[in-house]
């Protein structure tokens, strides 16, 4: 809560109050690593620098996994908005409406609001006369990596394939990442292993977590739409039940997905009946992805981040 303001009395001063600060619990729930053996004989027989290539690949893969996990939490914790089929004639209006909603929710308009747009959406933004290219905004904007600015948002192209997701708007103050522990990617000699001779391993590890601190500060826009997902306590300890609206096909779900559902792609997951299927072994902070399946392919998705009150104690 904000600090309270009171009238000041010159003779008696002002009564001191106490802070109403609330603290968020952040569970460190991701522990990822790479461990790839490179045989010395094989490495010597390859003309290019195999070791350097695998080190680069390991670093890229770990960073990519952390970014993917972060994006899943961001999308699941966001306020979902359904837009009509986006086109060059309504993209500007859609972005302005998001700007207005965020301002009404008292999200700071301090130049740090961002808009992550998929390549298809970015193509529409480029056709807007209201879009200002980064080259016209000065070094401060260029250094952020933004491609430009529109309606007060710094625009970043985001090559995401989540079904029907067009863009995510937000402010960096209201979503966070914690890097709890890391072992940088390196080449580990395995000579002392007692098993491998002349071999090494590309190893690295990251322990981290992500959390959305305020849902109204993050807006995930789907076009033509997303599933609406709500949760309630199940019948057994650790259980929850989901109610899904907006679907005409069959439903499947994945708990804490390593990657997100892609429109038109096949989907594994577990069969889900809205309001009936109980998902077991849930914990607060778990992300549930629900996919609508039509003709064996993903048509739309919805996400929810479970709260403790939605899980049977």
What are these regions (language model features)?
Residues 1-4, 22-29, 128-224:
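Sequence/fold signature of self-assembling virion shell proteins
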Residues 276-287:
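Surface-exposed, short loops/turns at beta-strand junctions within beta-sandwich domains
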Residues 244-251, 258:
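Short proline/glycine-enriched turn/loop motifs at strand-loop junctions of beta-rich domains
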Residues 233-247:
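Short coil/turn motif common to extracellular beta-sandwich-like domains
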Residues 76-147, 263, 267:
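Extended, solvent-exposed, turn-rich assembly/linker loops in the middle of proteins
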Residues 40-107, 220-224:
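Alpha-helical scaffold segments that mediate packing/assembly in large oligomeric complexes
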Residues 297-311:
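Extracellular fibronectin type III
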Residues 287-293:
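Extracellular recognition modules
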């Amino acid at each position: 809560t904000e600090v309270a303001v009171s009238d000041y009395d010159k003779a008696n001063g002002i009564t001191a109050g106490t802070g109403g600060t609330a603290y968020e619990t952040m569970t460190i729930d991701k522990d990822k690593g790479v461990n790839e053996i490179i045989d010395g004989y094989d490495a010597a027989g390859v003309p290019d620098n195999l070791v350097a290539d695998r080190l680069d690949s390991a670093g890229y893969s770990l960073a990519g996994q952390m970014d993917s996990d972060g994006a899943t939490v961001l999308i699941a914790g966001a306020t979902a908005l359904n837009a009509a089929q986006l086109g060059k004639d309504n993209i500007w209006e859609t972005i302005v409406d998001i700007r207005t909603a965020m301002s009404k929710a008292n999200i700071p308009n301090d130049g740090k609001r961002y808009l992550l747009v998929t390549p298809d959406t970015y193509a529409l933004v480029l056709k807007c006369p209201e879009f200002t290219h980064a080259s016209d905004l000065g070094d401060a904007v260029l250094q952020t990596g933004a491609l430009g600015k529109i309606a007060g948002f710094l625009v970043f192209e985001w090559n995401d394939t989540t079904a029907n997701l067009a863009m995510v708007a937000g402010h960096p103050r209201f979503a966070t990442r914690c890097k709890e522990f890391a072992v940088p990617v390196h080449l580990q000699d395995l000579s002392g292993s007692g098993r491998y001779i002349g071999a090494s391993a590309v190893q690295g590890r990251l322990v981290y977590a992500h959390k959305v601190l305020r849902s109204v500060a993050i807006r995930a826009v789907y076009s033509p739409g997303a599933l609406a997902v709500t949760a309630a306590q199940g019948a057994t300890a650790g259980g929850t039940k989901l109610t899904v609206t907006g679907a005409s096909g069959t439903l499947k779900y994945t708990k804490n997905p390593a990657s997100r559902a892609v429109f038109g792609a096949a989907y594994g997951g577990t069969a889900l009946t809205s309001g009936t299927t109980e998902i077991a072994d849930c914990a607060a902070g778990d992300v549930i992805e629900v996919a609508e399946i039509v003709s064996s392919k993903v048509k739309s998705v919805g996400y929810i981040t479970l709260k403790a009150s939605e899980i049977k104690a």
